[in-house]
């Protein structure tokens, strides 16, 4: 099942186009550092390596994600086995994981989420083995996984908090004084040190990004969306299964040793909901609960001769599991993508139309008088737009694109004499309009036409030409143009 997941993802890896985050990773990879405003160095470095090996090849860029997704499926089955599942329970857990929203969505794209998924599951598997065997040396595996994960994002620290809280609540509390556990904590800090030092030296900008996410300024964020996502991120079909797994972990006498894992999810999801984080942050632990629930469900379906139980499980696969494939993978034609797909899967729309986006900007650039065209620059509202123009702009003779979004602000600001600016994605003429504050005059000169009917963040967006910079770039770049989210 793990191999089938990886192969399927690889077969579909070249469909549609780059995701905005992938374009950002590729651009960040040209500016390698030990940390960034919104992430660690791991994924940008990986993106640079893969694009160096095979420039412009989406399949190569996404191969690690497909492999990690297959690894996640294998780990879910392995966790079910640790809990005592037989072959049937392990297979059922693997199927639920393979068709889950979090595995399919993160396995299709190069993403920090894919790294998080595997890191959390490796740590969870080691935690379950530690609790089952009592051998605290397995804590070293937890420390190693969390440390590597924190080179991608600081999010694995949330799992560490959940596991420590789970042990405090359910025991065994002696683990918190164990030398191997303390050594594991040291490994985590040592591996994470480059990113942590960078964050500390720059005022922990990831906390600012987290605040923007909490305010709902990012996809899948905010308390309401985070709560709703709990019921669909694996699949609606899996909800009663992972709930059964949670109850069993917290109440089964024979699973007393594993109660800390159940409490870890309760603590983590509580923090996510209170803080307004993204609703998929706790998804790896939901897969752990699903592994436990698979064992409980298979036992329930096998009890006695009640054939309807097995029939009920089988009938639910088509309406509740298989739609994930259509909604989360690029199996439908991009030019005829139904609106409901983008409504459910925001990321699908963000992988369509980037070359056409660059064409739209190029048309505005070509329309400038020659003397302005030679000194014009592009200012984008977000990192996806800047990444797309870095990828597709040179072939269209476009000037360099700048942006103040997240770490883009640190990659450079426009030259001091850049007073003709093609502003992409900025809404002008409204109260609080930044373009009006920065420039003497701005003219709407075009709109983004991605040549497909898709409701994403860019299609139909405005393109202004602005002239007459009111204040030097050096005065406004870090204070006004800079923004996170």
Residue ranges of each PLM-predicted region?
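Membrane-interface transmembrane helices that cradle and orient dolichyl/undecaprenyl
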Residues: 83-84, 123-139, 244-253
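Short helix- or helix-capping micro-motifs
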Residues: 2, 93-98, 146, 150, ...
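Short acidic/glycine- and proline-prone juxtamembrane loop motifs at membrane-interface regions
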Residues: 102, 108-115
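Aromatic/acidic, Gly/Pro-rich catalytic loop(s) in extracytoplasmic/lumenal soluble domains
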Residues: 356-370, 397-485
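Transmembrane-lumen/periplasm boundary regions of multi-pass, lipid-linked membrane glycan transferases
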Residues: 160-258
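Transmembrane-helix motifs of polytopic, lipid-linked glycan transferases
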Residues: 63-84, 122
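Transmembrane-helix signature of polytopic, membrane-embedded enzymes
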Residues: 76-99, 118
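Specific aromatic-rich, kink-prone transmembrane helix
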Residues: 71-75, 115-133, 142-146
């Amino acid at each position: 099942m793990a191999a089938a997941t990886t192969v399927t993802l690889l077969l579909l890896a070249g469909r549609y186009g780059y995701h905005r985050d992938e374009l950002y990773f590729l651009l960040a990879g040209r500016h390698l550092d030990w940390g960034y405003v919104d992430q660690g160095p791991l994924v940008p470095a990986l993106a640079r390596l893969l694009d160096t090996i095979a420039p412009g090849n989406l399949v190569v860029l996404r191969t690690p994600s497909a492999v990690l997704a297959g690894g996640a499926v294998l780990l879910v089955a392995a966790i079910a086995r640790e809990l005592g599942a037989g072959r049937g329970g392990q297979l059922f857990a693997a199927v639920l994981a393979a068709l889950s929203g979090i595995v399919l969505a993160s396995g299709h794209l190069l993403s920090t989420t894919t790294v998080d998924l595997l890191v959390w599951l490796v740590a969870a598997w080691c935690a379950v083995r530690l609790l089952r065997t009592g051998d605290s040396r397995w804590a070293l595996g937890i420390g190693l996984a969390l440390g590597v994960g924190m080179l991608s994002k600081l999010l694995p620290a949330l799992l560490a908090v959940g596991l420590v809280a789970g042990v405090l609540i359910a025991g065994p509390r002696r683990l918190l004084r164990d030398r191997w556990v303390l050594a594991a904590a040291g490994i985590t800090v040592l591996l994470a040190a480059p990113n942590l030092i960078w964050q500390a030296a720059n005022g922990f900008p990831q906390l600012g990004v987290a605040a923007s996410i909490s305010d709902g300024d990012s996809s899948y964020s905010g308390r309401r969306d985070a709560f709703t996502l709990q019921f669909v991120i694996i699949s609606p079909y899996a909800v009663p299964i992972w709930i059964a797994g949670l109850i069993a972990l917290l109440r089964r006498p024979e699973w007393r040793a594993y109660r800390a894992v159940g409490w870890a999810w309760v603590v983590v999801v509580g923090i996510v909901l209170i803080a307004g984080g993204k609703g998929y942050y706790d998804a790896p632990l939901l897969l752990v609960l699903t592994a436990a629930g698979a064992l409980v469900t298979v036992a329930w379906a096998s009890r006695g001769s009640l054939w309807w139980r097995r029939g009920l499980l089988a009938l639910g696969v088509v309406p509740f599991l298989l739609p994930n494939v259509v909604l989360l993978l690029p199996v439908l034609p991009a030019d005829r993508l139904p609106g409901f797909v983008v409504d459910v899967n925001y990321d699908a729309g963000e992988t369509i139309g980037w070359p056409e986006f660059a064409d739209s900007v190029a048309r505005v650039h070509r329309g400038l008088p020659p003397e302005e065209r030679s000194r014009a620059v592009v200012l984008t509202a977000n990192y996806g737009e800047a990444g797309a123009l870095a990828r597709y702009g040179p072939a269209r003779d476009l000037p360099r694109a700048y942006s103040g979004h997240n770490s883009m602000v640190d990659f450079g600001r426009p030259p001091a004499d850049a007073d003709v600016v093609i502003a992409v994605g900025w809404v002008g003429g409204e109260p609080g309009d930044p373009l009006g504050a920065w420039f003497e005059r701005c003219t709407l000169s075009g709109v983004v036409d991605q040549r497909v009917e898709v409701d994403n963040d860019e299609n139909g967006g405005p393109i202004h030409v602005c002239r007459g910079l009111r204040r030097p770039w050096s005065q406004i770049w870090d204070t006004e143009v800079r923004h996170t989210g």
